[in-house]
């Protein structure tokens, strides 16, 4: 709009702009408070990255997520490190892909009707039950067997040791 000399009207239902990315300085301390949680911006679109960098500086941050299963901590999303640690193995990427395909084939030839079966058909029962099933039930407050399969279309599995949650900027 600035480059074209256009005017923009911005409407927000809240008393401030910024949506969930809103932050404000706390009066007494001057500390910036993120009212709706931490702000993580990431994109793989170079034009978007260049555009937003015209307006602000970004702090380099790599988001990593870990989960616990049976008292052991694993990196997420599921990657080659997760697979090898979980199965106490040293699979190559090709071997890990073959293992997951074999385990996911348990429901081959069926049309998954719920999230539970869809998850198993995507990554196999062992990984699904260890890392997805209970988290999903907690997140949705509903057993995965009662959730529609359409909720998940894929479960990311990386066949590298890259354990960054987002693999873009």
Roles of regions detected by a PLM:
Residues 70-72, 80-169:
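Active-site/ligand-binding neighborhood in enzyme catalytic cores
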Residues 2-27:
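Glycine-rich FAD pyrophosphate-binding loop
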Residues 18-19, 37, 124, 141:
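Glycine-centered flexibility sites
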């Amino acid at each position: 709009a600035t480059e074209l000399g256009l005017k923009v009207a911005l409407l927000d239902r809240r008393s401030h702009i910024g949506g969930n990315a809103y932050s404000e300085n706390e009066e007494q301390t001057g500390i910036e408070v993120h009212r709706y949680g931490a702000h993580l911006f990431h994109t793989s679109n170079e034009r978007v990255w260049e555009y937003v960098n015209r307006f602000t500086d970004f702090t380099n941050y790599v988001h990593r997520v870990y989960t616990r299963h049976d008292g052991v901590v694993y990196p997420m999303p599921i990657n080659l490190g997760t697979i090898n640690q979980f199965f106490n193995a040293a699979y190559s990427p090709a071997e890990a892909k073959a293992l997951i395909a074999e385990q996911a084939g348990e429901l081959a030839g069926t049309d998954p009707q719920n999230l539970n079966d869809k998850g198993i058909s995507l990554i196999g029962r062992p990984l699904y039950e260890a890392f997805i099933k209970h988290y999903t039930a907690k997140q949705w407050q509903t057993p995965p067997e009662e959730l529609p399969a359409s909720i998940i279309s894929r479960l990311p599995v990386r066949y590298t040791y890259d354990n960054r949650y987002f693999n873009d900027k």
